[in-house]
Amino acid sequence: MGLNKLYLGETREAVESFRRADAIAPRDPERWTWLQGLGRALMQLGHDAEAVDALCQTMDSNPGYLRGKAMLAAAEALTGNLEGAKLHLAQYAAAEPDMTVRRFAAQRSSVPPDAVSPTYRRESERIFDGLRRAGMPD
């Protein structure tokens, strides 16, 4: 439900939904799925330090989640921690050396771009800015 809220541009409601999911099932092996959504939503709202925390928990829950490394790099960059951002982006780039911000944005999900709200698209620009700051080429 949180991802639906996120794509509809109801970002604050998405945060509430992701937090509710975590309160209900904090030991669920798939916990990383809503934690990455929480991290993304928090970043979109400008709560970058909280996003770093959620995305670190995402990576603790699923260390192999490659896209999470890039999202964590973006959040770290937005907090001003460029050293941490570059480290996480380097880990991501080792597996995806040709990734660009444009390609990353296009791969965001299986939801068609015209099905997401303008609010979601606008707020997602913060994440792409974080990726650029971390060193991902346009």
Predicted regions and their residues:
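Alpha-helical protein-protein interaction modules
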Residues: 2-138
